[in-house]
A protein has these predicted regions:
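Active-site-proximal helices and loops of the catalytic beta/alpha 8
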Residues: 315-318, 322-386
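Aromatic sugar-binding surface patches on proteins
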Residues: 59-68
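N-terminal structural segment of carbohydrate-active enzymes
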Residues: 69-227, 231-244
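Active-site-adjacent "subsite" loops/lids of carbohydrate-active enzymes
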Residues: 268-324, 334
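Edge beta-strands of extracellular beta-sandwich domains
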Residues: 2-12, 92-100
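Aromatic- and acidic-residue-enriched segments that line the glycan-binding/catalytic groove
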Residues: 139, 185-214, 254-289, 375-383
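Loop/turn elements at helix/coil->beta-strand transitions in domains of secreted/extracellular proteins
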Residues: 118-122, 170-177, 242-249, 324-329, ...
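Extracellular ectodomain segments of secreted/surface proteins
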Residues: 6-37
Length: 386
């Protein structure tokens, strides 16, 4: 019934176990095979995030569990989902997600669409390294300070469009393409520790500066990277993907900006301190200084706990949804961004796009509790857990 409280335990990854497999279904029941024998197996069954009123029929000596399909489930219209959780003896078994359409269990993959979030097959690509579809935007640095492997290679949005049209993704069964960031990055090279020998370049060494081919050093948060695309090429790629029944999600960087960005030039106090109170350098302290640490000297972490910083940065993210038909975001470095940012972004999205299907997927490395703290109503829909 609505409003009932239930607890789903969070356990270390080592205590997860594959133990549940769907076996069969009828109009009134779903049968699950339990792969091992468990004593005191505890169940939680949800339909549309509301707990089932009937208990799971399970005998530890049997290898099957029976879930009753309740009247409200059978009478529902459109897509709905049953979720099954189980744990026993300190182990959490794999959860099951069972889609329903108009009250009937979906058992044909052809019935799934790009709007079924949990059934997506994602293809992650780095734009610069994928395919070159427009040689007119190829601008390598060709600098003796930059090894070719970390220079721009020519991949672009036009190349993605070409591969969609050729059926590359269709043949793989891809339903969602996750593209690397497309915000404008610096034109010069960065990210190298000082040269030895009086700061002079030595061709016998393998050290190098880096281009921004990866896209994670935004100079502007609302302008496309000219080496990758024009706005029209981006519109064309999104339209082509949707024609092929594919989503496109954008990797978006909110945690930091390049030190030479006009934003930080105008607001030099908008970043966190690079020196800790005890005098240590605040770099790469991923857990100790999770919300303030810098990734590198040239990409300061934004102080997003401050409203005057958080508000315009959430607005910048929304520009990509206002101007382009993206299906969502893969958010970079989520655990280094405070919760107030996600709450504000989620609230603005709900107000601005009440009827639009938008993914919010995050990247967080850490324990299940930290990962799960961002997956809440009005924040992220899901996080990667690897």
């Amino acid at each position: 019934a609505k409003g009932l409280h239930y607890d789903i335990p969070i356990v270390p990854q080592s205590q997860y176990e594959v133990g549940l497999v769907t076996k069969s279904f009828s109009d009134s029941t779903i049968t699950i095979t339990v792969l091992n024998e468990y004593e005191q197996l505890q169940w939680c069954v949800l339909w549309q995030d509301t707990r089932a009123t009937k208990s799971v029929e399970y005998n530890p000596s049997d290898d099957q569990a029976i879930i009753s399909i309740e009247p409200a489930w059978r009478e529902s219209k459109g897509r709905s989902f049953i979720r099954v959780y189980a744990h026993a003896n300190g182990k959490q078994l794999n959860d099951l997600l069972i889609p329903m359409q108009d009250g009937k269990v979906v058992n044909d993959v052809a019935e799934l669409t790009r709007f079924d979030d949990h059934a997506q097959i994602l293809y992650s690509l780095m734009i610069d390294r994928f395919h070159n579809g427009n040689k007119n935007n190829d601008w390598k640095m060709n600098s003796p300070e930059v090894l070719d492997i970390v220079d721009y290679q020519g991949g672009d949005i036009a190349g993605i469009t070409k591969k969609i049209k050729e059926g590359f993704f269709d043949e793989l069964g891809i339903t969602t393409i996750w593209i690397s960031p497309i915000t404008q990055n610096p034109w010069d090279a960065w990210g190298m520790y000082p040269f030895p020998n009086g700061n002079k370049y030595d061709s016998t060494k393998t050290y190098t500066k880096f281009s921004g081919y990866h896209g994670y050093w935004p100079i502007f948060t609302t302008e496309v990277e000219k080496r990758f695309t024009t706005e029209q090429e981006l519109h064309d790629m999104l339209a082509t993907a949707h024609k092929h029944s594919m989503n496109v999600i954008l990797d978006y960087v909110a945690n930091h900006m390049h030190i030479n960005s006009p934003t930080l030039q105008a607001h030099p106090d908008w970043h966190t301190d690079s020196i800790l109170p005890d005098g240590r350098r605040n770099f790469e302290l991923w857990d100790e200084a999770r919300l303030t640490t810098w990734f590198d000297v040239h990409i300061p972490t934004l102080d997003l706990e401050r409203p005057e910083v958080c508000s315009p940065m959430t607005d910048s993210a929304l520009v990509w949804l206002d101007k382009f038909a993206f299906d969502g975001f893969r958010h970079d470095a989520c655990k280094h961004i405070p919760l107030n940012y996600w709450r504000e972004l989620g609230a603005k999205m709900k107000q601005r796009y009440p009827d639009r299907h938008i993914w919010m997927i995050g990247e967080t490395y850490g324990d299940p509790a930290l990962i799960g703290s961002y997956v809440k109503t009005g924040m992220l829909n899901a996080q990667f857990d690897f």
